[in-house]
């Protein structure tokens, strides 16, 4: 038995090579599309119309950069048979036909526009045109009279769909269920993304000293991640000193001072797959209150990890975490996200979601192939410090494997005096 997590999930180099099996992207595309179609059957949907960016990438393997993330300016249609169809932002439709010619042509990669989130009003006719094209594609597929799932649409577009006689229902649950079980290729990509953050935490640990700002850490982390191949840094939480309690969920330009406890969360995207990965340090020297807070956070984490295996349920995990009132909050809604578990994949918050807020009443079964993060938070008795830990893990046939490997067994003191 090892005393700390070691690399047991492969994280090969990120280049394409002829001498080693790495990620098979064609296999990845086929797996994801098959998962979506399985859920269309399970949820009795003739098709799903996707506006949410992570869903579009999962189902169609297309993306145009994160400037367009969840702006509603592109959408996709997936039916139980045939090729997905993408309506994209202007010239991006032509680019897809060039980039993936075996998947897209002039019939299923076309331009589309629903008004740029209201910047172009319904009087332009763009909303009505988009829905006419969607309905025509559904009729061509023979499913226009079926239940049609929609994930996250603008109100104006949704109303136009209903006016056109489409039987629109919730499609997001089908997509969430599709995404909850990861393929071996997805697990490699998620592990590679974590390996990048392992390296950034080494840099943060060496960087932490008085005079460095929270925002300086954020800037360095962005540069390092992009240098290693990240395609998008969604967030770097950088929280120090009295800002640790309560958790503000946003960095500032505060100067780090001797004795500060500081915690960080790095959320970035590599080849479409995210990380959510907290670590806590203290600068120069640590008080007993800070060490005690870290110890509590680690104990809650270890108790949760010990329960993770196929057949376990999310309420069993949530029950080992303290109640909101036990660490300074009025109720579970106010404390939500502090003792927390969530799937990680093409989206930041996927199934299963684990917390005392939702899991005690509506537990879900843990399944092999799930990949999720567990997060714990313990405020210190000094009223200002706090410890925050997060581990990502893969559910295996007989337990789980941790893939976030920067040391976290005990409180680490950066640049110790």
State each model region's role.
Residues 1-417:
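Active-site neighborhoods and metal-handling regions in enzymes and metal-associated proteins
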